[in-house]
Each structure stands twice: as C-alpha cells, then as structure tokens.
C-alpha cells in the first residue's frame, strides 16, 4: 500500500433538486455545484466540469512551482481546458478526453532554460496522473432511516 501523504474530507449537502453545497474540511468557503440545464438549473459547476478544472488547475499550479524552482520569470499564467463528454461502451456518459492548453508567459530569455522544466512538470501533477492511471473509488451507501434533519 502506498505511503499516506495527506487525507482530506469533503462534505456535500443537498440544497434543492440537484444543487449541492460542497464543504472542504480546511476551508471556510463553500461551493455550490449543480447539474447542467435539462437536469439541473446550472447554478454552479457540474461534477464533470469540476474534474476538468481540477486537472487544469493542478497542471497550472505544478508548472508555476517548477518554473519558480528553476528561477524562470513568468509574465502570466493561463490555462484553457476542454473536456469531451462521450457515450461509453455501456452507452452511459463518460469523460472521453480532457485537453489542457497552458500559456506560462515565458520571457524570451528563459525559453531555452525552460525546456527541462516543461518536460518534467506534468509527471508531478497529482490530479492528472491519478486520473490517467485510474483511481480506486470505493462507494458505501448508508441504509439506515433518516431522522429528517
């Protein structure tokens, strides 16, 4: 079994219909998630958008970390993430591909020095590499009666 680095907890509570308030264990801020139009009201990002955003954000932050360690100056950092929802073999929706385009705003003088950084950072992105490898997801559904609170 791999060595544990950190464990975290995220809680979700239904607001109404498909809207859920997401609470992160170490943050005061919450996030409202919802289903897209046709199912939900599109009041917040949906789970597939959050997964794509997590991949893009992790890659972007990892690139910034590597650039700083290499002493590279970034004039800006931008990312564009495009995900495609497709029908899987069983006919159910699945994320078929997540495409991430990064623009780190490298200074002309740093272009050559940046090569090693740009070739290595991707492997250190925990979210991207976990998604690529497949994640062990374990689901348990409580079967006790609700008290209605």
Which positions does each model-derived feature cover?
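Extended beta-strand/beta-hairpin segments
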Residues: 1-53, 64-149
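Alpha-helical metal-binding/catalytic segments enriched in His/Glu/Asp
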Residues: 58-59
């Amino acid at each position: 079994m791999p060595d544990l680095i950190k464990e975290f907890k995220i809680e979700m509570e239904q607001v109404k219909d498909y809207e859920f308030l997401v609470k992160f264990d170490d943050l005061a801020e919450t996030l409202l998630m919802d289903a897209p139009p046709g199912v939900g009201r599109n009041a917040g990002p949906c789970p597939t958008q959050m997964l794509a955003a997590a991949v893009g954000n992790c890659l972007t932050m990892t690139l910034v970390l590597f650039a700083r360690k290499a002493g590279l100056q970034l004039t800006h950092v931008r990312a564009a993430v495009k995900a495609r929802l497709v029908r899987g073999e069983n006919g159910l929706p699945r994320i078929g591909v997540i495409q991430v385009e990064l623009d780190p705003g490298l200074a002309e003088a740093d272009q050559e020095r940046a090569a090693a950084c740009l070739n290595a950072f991707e492997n250190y992105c925990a979210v991207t590499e976990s998604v690529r490898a497949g994640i062990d997801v374990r689901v348990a559904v409580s079967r006790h009666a609700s008290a209605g609170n």
